[in-house]
Amino acid sequence: MATTKPYRVLLYYMYTTIENPEEFAAEHLEFCNSLELKGRILVAKEGINGTCSGTVEQTEKYMEAMNNDPRFDGIVFKIDEADGHAFKKMHVRPRPELVTLRLEDDINPHEITGKYLEPKDFYEAMKQEDTVIIDARNDYEFDLGHFKGAIKPDIESFRELPDWIRENKEVLEGKKILTYCTGGIRCEKFSGWLVREGYEDVSQLHGGIVTYGKDPEVQGELWDGQCYVFDERIAVPVNQKEHVIVGKDHFTGEPCERYVNCSNPECNKKILCSEENEAKYLRACSHECRVSPRNRYVIQHELTEEQVAAALEQIEAGK
């Protein structure tokens, strides 16, 4: 690929057997640090799930090493160009699961998973009338961007998805089911779970939203908004043909694509809000969070009690 920016962000996963995740994680962290990469990599007995950033040279060395390891034969790297690192630190952590579903009887994607659809086939399938599109991500990811007509499960974490499906099965019965997520890893298990639950026509977007947005044929069409990513960038564009903002400011409902975390560390909820409203509402999602003694916005900006009281009074006056 033609390189125009000095850094890259890699996104990848692979379901493969890693005998000793703890030992592998420690060695892999050392290796990543030697390359001066930064990122977040999860390792489990069932495989690896990672995203990391570095210079073109550093990421090339990393991909070469991974490709030379027989355990990762065939691994696919999704590559974004960047002006700098997308992470502050490098973490490699062992986990019981790569994606947290916590099923009593786990899904092995090598044994059972939904049909893979390439971007063009997924695009065509979305336009069919008897199709249901399920977003397999969390609610705050959906709120920033999603496929047109996709169903938003009312969940805050991936492990809540099976229960939501069981409670809303009438929406899916007799339909062709399409499911998608950021890079594809969640759908490997989720689509397999749907098949095991008895749904007969289940397909997943191969490579996820990130691959769909880069596809030269579909060019991200039928996607509205941006794609939430778990690094310093927060959001990346998908639709190359038109940019429709679907995110709404938490306080005013105006179009917004800027995420912040609630300033109350005990809440930490992700909210969409403008810089202006961040200052006006002390970056807090509610009155309770605004008056929290641990409000990070108040502490960071060294606001006095009088200044906080004035801000609260202004909010009250504006209601």
From Swiss-Prot:
Which residues belong to any copy of the Rhodanese domain? 127-221
- Residues at the active site: 181
Q: Is Secreted given among the entry's keywords?
A: no
The record lists the membrane-crossing segments as none
Q: Which family does it belong to?
A: Belongs to the TrhO family.
* InterPro entries linked to this entry: Rhodanese-like_dom, Rhodanese-like_dom_sf, Rhodanese_C, TrhO, TRHO_N
Domain of life per record: Bacteria
Per its record, the protein catalyses:
uridine(34) in tRNA + AH2 + O2 = 5-hydroxyuridine(34) in tRNA + A + H2O
The protein's Enzyme Commission number: 1.14.-.-
Q: Which residues form a coiled coil?
A: none
What's the encoding gene here? trhO
Spell out the NCBIfam families in the cross-references. PRK00142.1-3 (NF001135)
Q: What is this protein called?
A: tRNA uridine(34) hydroxylase
Keyword check for tRNA processing: yes
Tell me the classification of the organism that encodes this protein: Bacteria, Bacillati, Bacillota, Bacilli, Bacillales
Q: What keyword terms does UniProt attach to this protein?
A: Oxidoreductase, tRNA processing
Any GO molecular function: oxidoreductase activity, acting on paired donors, with incorporation or reduction of molecular oxygen
Q: What does this protein do?
A: Catalyzes oxygen-dependent 5-hydroxyuridine (ho5U) modification at position 34 in tRNAs.
What Gene Ontology biological process does one annotation of this record name? tRNA modification
